[in-house]
From Swiss-Prot:
Functional note: Transcription factor that, with ptaR1 and ptaR2, coregulates the expression of the gene cluster that mediates the biosynthesis of pestheic acid, a diphenyl ether which is a biosynthetic precursor of the unique chloropupukeananes.
Gene3D superfamilies: Zn(2)-C6 fungal-type DNA-binding domain
One Pfam match: Zn_clus
Subcellular location: Nucleus
Record keywords, A-Z: DNA-binding, Metal-binding, Nucleus, Transcription, Transcription regulation, Zinc
SMART domains listed in its UniProt record: GAL4
GO molecular function, one term: zinc ion binding
PROSITE patterns: ZN2_CY6_FUNGAL_1, ZN2_CY6_FUNGAL_2
DNA-binding region range list: 11-38
Biased composition (Polar residues): 97-113
Protein name per the record: Pestheic acid cluster transcriptional regulator 3
Stretches the record annotates as Disordered: 71-123
Length: 564
C-alpha cells in the first residue's frame, strides 16, 4: 500500500528557511532539533508579508540557529564524586532556552509537572534507595526572564499581595516555578512579553523579533505541557489515584493572565474554566487525591492557621490557599461581566467566611465578607438572565434576596467605618498602617460598587436618584484618598460605578482614571476595552430611554471583559 501523498510545502518555518520539512505533527523534526518555533501548517502567519516583519523573523531564526550550533557546553551540574544520572532529564531543560543540537526529544512517561529543575533518581550505589539530587543550571536567558517575572510581572498581577512571614514570602512561588515545567514556561512567556513591551522602542527590529520568537516558544511549550498534565490528571482522577494538581492549576491561571494581557479575545475564559474544574474537583474530593502531605491536608481541611509546620507544609498550604483564593476571585470577576452565576458559588460561604484562613484582602485587596456578597449579586444577576427570573414572576424572592444582600453590605460598611476610625487613631500615634489602609480603601470602593451593581441588577438604570449619595461618596473617596497607584486594584469598581456616572465632571473623572498611565500599563492592554465599553454605555444611556442592564451584559465586548 503506497504512502499517502504529502504536501511539498512543509511547515511555515521551513518554507521561510527554504529547508526540507518532514511535516511532523504537531511540529516538524527539523524545528524541534534546532529548538526554533514551528509555525505549523495552518493559515499563513501575519508576519509572512514579504516585508520587514518577515525579514525580522527570518533574521531571528538565523540568529537562534547559529547560536544553537555553537552551544556545546553541558547543561547539568553533577555534584562532585557522583556519576551523571543516566535518566533522561525532564524536557524543560530543552525548551527553557536555546539548547544544543544533541538534545533528546523522546516522549516522556512521567507527568510533565513532576520535577521541573529538581531531578531525583535512585542511585544504583544506594541499596537503601536513598535519593540523590541533581540540580540543573538555569540558562542565563531564562534566569533574566525568571527574575523579571518574580520582581515585576507577578507584583503587577497581584499588587495587593503581602505574604505573611510565616508563609515564607514568595518562596512557594519560586519552588513551584522550578518544579513545574508548564508553569516555568508560562512565567517565561509572560515575562518575555512584558519585557518586550517595556523596551520595544529601545531595541532593534531583530531583537524584537528574537524576543517574539522566544515568547512563542515558551508559550507553545507551556500549552503542550498543560494539555499533557490535564490528560494525566483526568486519568488519575478516574482511577482514584493521587495527582500533582497545584503546579498545573497555577500554570493555567498564568495562561489566563497571558491571554488577557496579549489581547487574545476570549481565549482566557477556556483556561479559567479549566482552573475552576481542577479546584472544584479537589474540593469535592476533600483533597483526598491531591498530591499533598497528610499534614498539609489536615491543616487545609480544618482551616487551621499556619504555625511552625516545616517548609514543605508551609509551601503546600500557602500555594493551595493562594491559588484557591485567586480562582474564586477570577470566577466572580468573570461572572460580573458575563452575567452568569459564579461556578464556585457553593464554596463562598466556607472559603470566604470572615474567619477563613483564605484572605482575599491579601490577594486582591477586598475583604472576604464583601466579596461573598458580590458573589451573591453576581448569582442574582445570573438567575435573572439564565433562569428567566422576572419582577412579575419572581418579584418577592428577587427583592427579598436583594434586601438581605444590601443589609449585609450596610452592616459590613458600618464595621469598616469603625475600623477606619481605629486606623486613624493608630496613625496619629505614629503606627504605620499603609497596607491596612489600602485594604480599607479597596474594600470601601468595592462596597460602593456592590450597592450600585445590586441596584442595576434589580432596577436597571431606573431610579438612579436613589444612588446619588452612594455615587457622591465613591467620587469623594476616589478624588481625596485613593492614590494613583491603587487604580489598577479597583478597575471593577471604576467600571460599575462609572456606568451610572452623570454627564460632565463625573464621567470625566472615571474616564481620566481608566485612561491614566497607572491604569493603562503596557501589560494591561485589555483595559482599553474596559474604557471603550464604558464610553459606549454612556452613549447608549444618552440616546435610549429604555436602555437596561441586560443590554450592557449583551454588548459583544462586555461579555469577554475581565476587570483586572
Amino acid at each position: 500500500m503506497s504512502n499517502p501523498v504529502r504536501s511539498k510545502g512543509g511547515c511555515w518555518t521551513c518554507r521561510l528557511r527554504r529547508k526540507k520539512c518532514d511535516e511532523g505533527k504537531p511540529e516538524c523534526t527539523t524545528c524541534q532539533a534546532l529548538s526554533i518555533t514551528c509555525y505549523g501548517y495552518g493559515p499563513k502567519p501575519e508576519w509572512m508579508d514579504n516585508g520587514d516583519a518577515e525579514k525580522d523573523v527570518a533574521n531571528s531564526l538565523k540568529h537562534i540557529v547559529r547560536y544553537t550550533s555553537r552551544r556545546t557546553s553541558s547543561r547539568y551540574r553533577v555534584p562532585p564524586g557522583q556519576k551523571a544520572n543516566p535518566k533522561l532529564a525532564p524536557k524543560v531543560h530543552a525548551a527553557a532556552s536555546t539548547p544544543s543540537t544533541n538534545t533528546s526529544h523522546s516522549t516522556e512517561t512521567t507527568p510533565p509537572s513532576d520535577n521541573g529543575f529538581y531531578d531525583t533518581a535512585e542511585s544504583p550505589l544506594s541499596p537503601n534507595g536513598a535519593q540523590h539530587l541533581t540540580i540543573a543550571t538555569i540558562p542565563a536567558e531564562d534566569s533574566i526572564l525568571l527574575m523579571h517575572f518574580l520582581d515585576k510581572v507577578f507584583p503587577l498581577q497581584y499588587p495587593m499581595y503581602r505574604p505573611d512571614i510565616l508563609e515564607g514570602g514568595r518562596g512557594w512561588l519560586l519552588a513551584l516555578l522550578l518544579q513545574t515545567k508548564s508553569l516555568y514556561h508560562a512565567a517565561l512567556a509572560l515575562s518575555s512579553y512584558h519585557r518586550r513591551m517595556l523596551v520595544f522602542e529601545r531595541i532593534s527590529e531583530q531583537c524584537r523579533a528574537t524576543a517574539a520568537v522566544q515568547q512563542e516558544k515558551h508559550l507553545e511549550t507551556c500549552l503542550n505541557e498543560v494539555r499533557q498534565a490535564m490528560v494525566i490528571l483526568d486519568q488519575r482522577t478516574r482511577q482514584r489515584k493521587s495527582y500533582d494538581g497545584m503546579g498545573t492549576v497555577t500554570s493555567i491561571v498564568q495562561l489566563v493572565f497571558f491571554e488577557l494581557f496579549a489581547g487574545q479575545d476570549h481565549a482566557w475564559r477556556t483556561h479559567l474554566n479549566a482552573a475552576i474544574d481542577v479546584y472544584d474537583q479537589n474540593c469535592r474530593d476533600k483533597l483526598e487525591h491531591l498530591d499533598l502531605s497528610e499534614a498539609s491536608k489536615t491543616i487545609l481541611r480544618n482551616d487551621q492557621r499556619l504555625a511552625v509546620d516545616g517548609a514543605l507544609v508551609t509551601q503546600e498550604v500557602t500555594t493551595f490557599r493562594f491559588m484557591g483564593g485567586s480562582i474564586i476571585w477570577l470566577d466572580i470577576l468573570s461572572s460580573l461581566a458575563a452575567g452568569s452565576v459564579p461556578r464556585l458559588l457553593s464554596y463562598h460561604q466556607g472559603v470566604l467566611d470572615a474567619a477563613s484562613q483564605v484572605k482575599l484582602e491579601n490577594i486582591m485587596g477586598c475583604k472576604n465578607w464583601l466579596m461573598c456578597q458580590i458573589g451573591r449579586i453576581a448569582a442574582l444577576q445570573g438567575h435573572r438572565r439564565q433562569d428567566g427570573w422576572t419582577s412579575q414572576r419572581h418579584g418577592i424572592k428577587l427583592h427579598s434576596i436583594a434586601a438581605d444582600i444590601k443589609s449585609e453590605i450596610e452592616s459590613g460598611m458600618a464595621r469598616e467605618a469603625l475600623e477606619s476610625l481605629n486606623i486613624q487613631t493608630s496613625d496619629s500615634c505614629g503606627i504605620n498602617n499603609s497596607s491596612t489602609n489600602s485594604v480599607t480603601l479597596t474594600t470601601r470602593m468595592f462596597a460602593f460598587m456592590a450597592i450600585i451593581h445590586l441596584h442595576l441588577v434589580t432596577h436597571d438604570f431606573e431610579r438612579l436618584d436613589n444612588l446619588r449619595e452612594t455615587i457622591a461618596d465613591a467620587i469623594r473617596l476616589l478624588q481625596s484618598q485613593v492614590p494613583c497607584s491603587m487604580i489598577p486594584v479597583i478597575v471593577a469598581p471604576l467600571f460599575i460605578i462609572g456606568c451610572v456616572a452623570a454627564q460632565g465632571d463625573e464621567q470625566s473623572l472615571f474616564r481620566a482614571s481608566l485612561a491614566s498611565d497607572t491604569s493603562q500599563h503596557r501589560l494591561y492592554r485589555h483595559r482599553k476595552d474596559v474604557l471603550s465599553a464604558l464610553e459606549e454605555i454612556w452613549s447608549k444611556r444618552q440616546t435610549s430611554t429604555d436602555y437596561t442592564w441586560n443590554d450592557v451584559l449583551d454588548m459583544g465586548q462586555h461579555k469577554y471583559l475581565l476587570f483586572l
